């Protein structure tokens, strides 16, 4: 499967034509996610033996960028799934092995809850029990509610271990969600999830290991940047040839180096370029860009999302410098 050609075709022929409708929907249309599954993209990072593509990291980044150029909302719900595939495929827990193929084929779909993995005081705590674990706390942003089957959830123990598990994406007395209203990507159906002594069977645990606080590895920052690059790429295509094309290529090349010393600034640059490209498209479009039926206004809001989503201090500082707003 030529996943790059497939991603480009789906972005141009399926996601982009539906993007304005998706933007105003209550949740991403299921048929769009089904299309990605049928194309094999839910298994992008999964093993071939389980129905995956086993794409290398540069290919994953390119696919994310191409899909994001079609519709950031749909892409964002889908991309949350990829980490669960990698975790399940690499798990030492034999019971998790049964999940790998359904996840790769998109028969089971996963969201992401990072409450226990966020630096500082853990928002989500894990306590070991006779049959597994209980999770208590909050994950402030969980996307894809009612579109995912499980949530790949991180919780931290009092003795400094990080527990990852697949928990059912289903409300209960111990898992309560509150729908959030977003100015961009609202159809991601993002919720705040509160867990109270929520039982997690040992069979659902993908990994348990030491929690290490430190700089974010380059790879997740590169994926975050790919979302913004996709928005910028679509804006550049709608604008036609401009100096922004070369600037976008330079930022992408710097990100591809995965240099720990520059990746945070480069991730910030991706969001800043997307914002300027979207603003340029709005100006070129004129007053039509104020209409909810025009792509320019959607792309400006998506660029805002790409600018601030999961923004780390190093990236934030770099963006403020670029915006000439650094203290």
What are these regions, as identified by a protein language model?
Residues 138-171:
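DPxDG-like acidic metal-binding loop motif
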Residues 130-134, 150, 190:
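A generic structural signal for beta-strand entry/edge sites
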Residues 108, 120-122, 147-149, 161, ...:
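A generic structural signal for well-ordered coil/turn residues at beta-strand boundaries
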Residues 2-49, 53-62, 223-327:
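Alpha-helical interface subdomain recognition
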Residues 28-38, 42-143:
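Glycine-rich flavin
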Residues 91-93, 129-130, 156-159, 169-172, ...:
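Short loop segments at secondary-structure junctions
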Residues 178-253:
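Glycine-rich beta->alpha junctions and the first turn(s) of the following alpha-helix
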């Amino acid at each position: 499967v030529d996943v790059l050609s497939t991603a480009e075709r789906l972005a141009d022929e399926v996601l982009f034509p539906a993007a304005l409708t998706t933007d105003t929907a209550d949740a991403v249309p299921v048929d769009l996610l089904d299309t990605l599954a049928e194309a094999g993209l839910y298994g992008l990072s999964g093993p071939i033996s389980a129905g995956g593509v086993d794409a290398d990291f540069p290919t994953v980044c390119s696919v994310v960028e191409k899909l994001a150029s079609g519709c950031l909302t749909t892409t964002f719900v889908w991309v949350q799934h990829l980490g669960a595939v990698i975790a399940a495929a690499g798990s030492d827990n034999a019971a998790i092995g049964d999940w790998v193929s359904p996840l790769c084929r998109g028969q089971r779909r996963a969201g992401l809850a990072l409450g226990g993995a966020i630096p500082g005081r853990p928002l989500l705590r894990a306590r070991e029990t006779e049959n597994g674990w209980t999770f208590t706390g909050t994950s402030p942003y969980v996307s894809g509610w009612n579109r995912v089957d499980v949530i790949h959830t991180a919780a931290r123990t009092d003795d400094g271990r990080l527990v990852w598990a697949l928990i059912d994406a289903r409300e209960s007395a111990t898992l309560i969600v509150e729908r959030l209203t977003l100015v961009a990507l609202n159809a991601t159906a993002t919720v705040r999830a509160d867990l109270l002594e929520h039982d997690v069977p040992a069979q659902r645990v993908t990994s348990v290991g030491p929690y290490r606080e430190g700089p974010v590895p380059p790879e997740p920052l590169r994926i975050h940047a790919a979302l913004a690059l996709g928005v910028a790429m679509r804006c550049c295509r709608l604008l036609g040839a401009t100096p922004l094309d070369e600037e976008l290529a330079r930022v992408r090349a710097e990100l591809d180096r995965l240099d720990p010393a520059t990746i945070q600034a480069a991730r910030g640059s991706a969001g800043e370029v997307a914002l300027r490209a979207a603003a340029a498209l709005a100006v070129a479009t004129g007053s039509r860009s104020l209409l909810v039926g025009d792509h320019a206004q959607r792309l400006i809001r998506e660029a805002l999302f790409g600018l601030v989503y999961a923004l780390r201090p190093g990236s934030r500082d770099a963006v403020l410098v670029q915006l000439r707003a650094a203290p």
